[in-house]
Amino acid sequence: EKTFLGHTGDLNGDDIIDIIAKEPATARFICRHLYNFFVADEVQVPAWTIQDARDEDALEMMINAFEESGYEIKAVLRTMFNSDFFKNARYSKIKSPAEVVASTLKMVGSYQTPEPTIPDIGPESTYMGQSLLDPPSVEGWYTGQEWINSGSLLARINFVADRVANTSLPGISAIIGHIKSDGVNSPEELVEASLEHMGFLEVGDETMSQLLDHAKAEGNMNWNDEAAAGTRVGEMLALVGATTEYQFG
């Protein structure tokens, strides 16, 4: 016979898990982790005991689903994925270095089949602060804004900019083709199209002004010179990739 968290009896491993699952702190801990992973960046885990959740109402909804379902994770996920707070959470998570690398390569169409140079990509996330399969501790990596510092930000910007400006890559070539076929001509249209193709990005007034100033310096698009027009599109995509809104959302 043993006592665990106030429960005494002939307890086995399953009993211990059941007792832990029914603790109020368990529901909050699990649901806050799920919110942090799928919805929006939270403060780091060590601060959870002293700082409220980013969205207490959302967290309470998830906790209720967990408890009312008999402690089923799938009920929490169903509630979360069908919720308005999940559907409305855009640009609420900072990409990890692995996500920056993978999403960029997917967008530009690199490495669609196995290639000898694939191992060369591995260190890129390390330069941004995430050595794959080698977390700093059993706790894993601190996420959210912890991914960003002066060194990692430069590495992130350079990785994205170098690739989206490469008009020979199939994904970028396709973007240029779409922009051309859509009849994009004015600097304003070029900026809007570039933001759309980089993820329907919403930027602030200051960022928009800077992008427009750059686009207006070269006037309207000249699609008669396809190489120059493509280069111009690539440059604009690279500028978008360097914005605060892209890197922090």
Question: Over which residues does each language-model region extend?
Answer:
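A Trp-anchored, charged/polar loop motif used as the substrate-binding/catalytic surface
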Residues: 12-19, 23
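Flexible, low-complexity segments enriched for small/polar residues
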Residues: 23, 27, 31-69, 77-249
